[in-house]
Structures are given as C-alpha cells and as structure tokens.
UniProtKB/Swiss-Prot annotation:
It comes from Mus musculus. Residues 90-114 form a coiled coil. This is RELT-like protein 1. The gene is Rell1. The chain crosses the membrane at residues 59-79. GO terms for biological process: positive regulation of p38MAPK cascade.
Length: 272
C-alpha cells in the first residue's frame, strides 16, 4: 500500500534495480558457458586434414631420390663437356685405395688358408724389405766367414741345383721350390717338402710396394683441385705443332752455330 503513495520516478528506479539484479546471474551464466565452450574448442586436437603443416615423411624419399639422381647425371654431363674442351677429371686417391683393398684381400685369403704358424711369422718378417735385406746380408756374411757352413740353395751366390741321375745307394737331394717360404728346420733330405706334399701353400705373389705416380702429360696444367677431384687441362696438339715448327725453323737458321738474326738486324744489313 505504501508503494502507491511513492512518486512515479521512485517506482521506476526500483523496478529497474530489481530487473538488473535478476538478469545479471543469467548473463554471467551465459558468459561462463561461452568461456567453457571456447576452452573446449581450444583444447581439442586439430585433425590432420585441417592442419596443413602435417606432411607424410614417407613421401620425402620420393622427392630426394630423383634429386640426387639428377645431380649425379649433371656431374657426369659437366665432366663430359670439360673433357670435350680439353680438360680431364680424375680421382687418383680412390684408385690407390682400391688397389690397397685388393692387396689386403689377397693377403688375408692366403693367411686363412695357411695353417702353419711358423710360416706366417716368416711371411710377416719377410714382408718388410729392410728385414729381408738384413737377413740376406747375414746369410752372406756367415757363408763367407765360415768355410764349413753348408751352402743352401736359398743363400745368395749359390749355384742352382740341377737334378741329376741318382746312384743306387745315394740319398735324394734336397727339394728346391721357390714358390713358397721355407720355415726354420726345413733342411731335411727329402725329394718333396711337406708343404708341397699337402698342397696347402699357394704361390707367393710379389707385392709391388713402390707405386709409381701417374706420369703427367706434356703441357698438362691443373685447373681445379678439390680433395680427390682434379680437373686438368692439356694443350691442343696444334699449339705443340706450331712450337715444334718454330723450333725447327730457328734450328735450320742456326746450323752453323750463328744466332738467328732478328728483324732489326736484317734491316741494318739491308741498309748497309
């Protein structure tokens, strides 16, 4: 009843205040709901179809293999063009490494097939040239200093043993075979040595340790050198022929030992 006595402005203000208090929780609830929806949307993982950054790693191989293939063909093409222009592309270090690998493989095969440990020791000792030279010098000194020292076919300076007809009571001579190394205590009077009888020892291949470098051609100039890769240029034969012709002409003019005359000297001689 007291409300009817209040002025109209007071009633209007009270109604607005009550309406705002009632509507404010609803707005807050809507805001929190919107925040929760946004947070859920942010926390959900993105699908691989929506994210353009996720790529398949197996497809990278299909791209890299053609790229490397094209690069190799491009290098071969460049070397071919340089060869046509007079250059030459070489990789000398790789050839030396391949030769060393082949020698190591052959040596390992011969050692594995050999079952005599003493023979392996002798082979390792004789592999060094200095040891071989010292051993030969020692054998030569012993054979010269000691008159009664027996002369074996392996000693330097000994005459070759020629097999001759055996007498009825004579013992067979010592077997001489230069295909493999003899161990200590091998001075046994047998016609065939133990190694040749079992046929376990292969022929020794002489190892060429001193490798001569590749002879450089006349007029060859190194243009580019990157590691093992080298590009060299050889002068054309026409330039060499011109030089030879000039040298021959100058040689004909100086047959009597006189120096070939220069154009200035020729003009002076003509004026005189």
């Amino acid at each position: 009843m007291a409300l009817w006595g209040l002025p109209g402005s007071a009633v209007l203000a009270a109604s607005v205040f009550v309406g705002g208090a009632v509507s404010s929780p609803l707005v807050a609830a809507d805001n929190t709901g919107s925040h929760t929806l946004h947070s859920r949307a942010e926390t959900t993982p993105s699908s691989p179809t929506n994210n353009p950054g996720n790529g398949h790693p197996e497809y990278i191989a299909y791209v890299l293999v053609p790229v490397f293939f094209v690069m190799g063909l491009l290098g071969v093409l460049i070397c071919h063009l340089l060869k046509k222009k007079g250059y030459r592309c070489t990789t000398e270090a790789e050839q030396e490494v391949e030769e060393e690998k082949v020698e190591k493989i052959e040596l390992n095969d011969s050692i594995n097939e050999n079952s005599d440990t003493v023979g392996q020791i002798v082979q390792y000792i004789m592999k060094n040239e200095a040891n071989a030279d010292i051993l030969k010098a020692m054998v030569a000194d012993n054979s010269v200093g000691d008159i009664e020292s027996p002369v074996t076919p392996s000693t330097p300076g000994s005459p070759p043993v020629s097999p001759g007809p055996l007498s009825p009571g004579a013992t067979p001579g010592k077997h001489v075979c230069g295909h493999h190394l003899h161990t200590v205590g091998g001075v046994v009077e047998r016609d065939v040595c133990q190694r040749c009888r079992h046929k376990r020892w292969h022929f020794i291949k002489p190892t060429n340790k001193t490798k001569e470098g590749r002879p450089r051609r006349q007029g060859e100039v190194t243009v580019l050198s990157v590691g093992r890769f080298r590009v060299t240029k050889v002068e054309h034969k026409s330039n060499q022929k011109e030089r030879r012709s000039l040298m021959s002409v100058s040689g004909i003019e100086s047959v009597n030992g006189d120096v070939p005359a220069t154009p200035v000297k020729r003009e002076r001689s003509d004026t005189e």
